[in-house]
Amino acid sequence: MKKIFLIVIFLIGLSVNAQTSKELVGKWQLVKWTKKGKEKSIQEYYKTDQVYQVFKENGDFESLVGEETHKAKWKLSKDNAELTIILVIMPVKFSVDYFDANKRIITTPQMGTFEYKKVTE
């Protein structure tokens, strides 16, 4: 269950101004986590600051936490307002607060708000 929560934390939705799933494809690093208005420590929670999400064109998804890799599938709603990550048979939905080619901000009621930056491999 903790691993599912780790994956859920990395999941981030997309929306705003005709952004497409093509812009989501790539590697994204978690740079900020806020819950109930307070910034949380990525390093303390994950035991590393190397926390990434990788979105592939074929719908494959990888959550990378340090040396751990968790695989899933992803899909973006037609209006780009919701990102769904499918973990085995359990879909996890994220709303999108902000998304452009280099930055994503998503929020989930359980874990808070996550900000990611796009990185080159």
Map each language-model feature to its residues:
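Lipid interaction determinants
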Residues: 16-121
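Positively charged n-region of N-terminal signal peptides that target proteins for export
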Residues: 1-4, 19
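Sec-dependent N-terminal signal peptides
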Residues: 4-13
